[in-house]
Amino acid sequence: MPPINTDHLKDIENQLAASRTLEKYQFSSCSRTHIGLVRKKNEDALYIDEQQGLWLVADGMGGIKGGDLASAVVVDNLRSFKRLETLSESIRDIEARFRLANTACRVMFEKRVVGSTVAAILNFESIVVFLWAGDSRIYR
């Protein structure tokens, strides 16, 4: 997977710095996962840190043993996330954490195929960014 190209974000960051009068978004959130009607185990993991502006759902690969563990690894790698000085630095940090989770799963589970998709929202001042890996989606 090629790294995220954040060059275009520098223009947005410059505009944001020039105009600090933009209204900041405020969020109220709650969370819930459900096993659904097909699986015997809930393979979802979620994490919310409103203070850092991060919401994410990791969805373990259904039907493959260990999907619940893989989604937990994704969440564990994001728990210590702290927003950095710029939006592009924060996005690069999240991307690095996604990659670390992928590497951790490969090492932990060796020859077993396990995996998780992830969909995340990052609120950075007045900019909201959607990030994902795999086929999980974010709808408005």
Where are each of the predicted segments found?
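PP2C/PPM-type serine/threonine phosphatase catalytic domain
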Residues: 1-140
